[in-house]
């Protein structure tokens, strides 16, 4: 659990984590990682609100062959595909939610 959970600061370093994950891929460092290390190293792609990063996430987690992680990546991807962002972050980041996002947030499993 993050010490900044439910606070805007929780997302302050996301860009750095994503940069490091991209470097890990670019340099091929992940090839020496075990599955748990790969799961962790690839998470910034899953947590990114950039659609292209979501596609990378799906490919990475699909190649890992762990159903639970792939299903989580797919869930994140589908939310970004539909809304272009994670609606559960709106309140924390002081973003205005659309009516569609508000309806979505009332459904079970809409938040992480």
Predicted features, each with a name:
Residues 52-68, 73-76:
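Charged, gly/pro-rich active-site loop segments
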């Amino acid at each position: 659990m993050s010490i900044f959970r439910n606070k805007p600061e929780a997302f302050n370093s996301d860009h750095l984590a994503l940069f490091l994950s991209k470097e890990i891929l670019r340099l091929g460092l992940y090839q020496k990682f075990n599955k748990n290390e790969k799961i962790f190293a690839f998470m910034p792609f899953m947590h990114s609100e950039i659609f292209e990063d979501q596609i990378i996430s799906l490919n990475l987690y699909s190649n890992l062959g762990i159903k639970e992680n792939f299903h989580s990546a797919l869930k994140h991807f589908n939310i970004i595909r539909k809304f272009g962002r994670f609606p559960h972050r709106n309140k924390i980041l002081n973003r205005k939610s659309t009516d569609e996002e508000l309806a979505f947030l009332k459904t079970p499993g809409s938040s992480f």
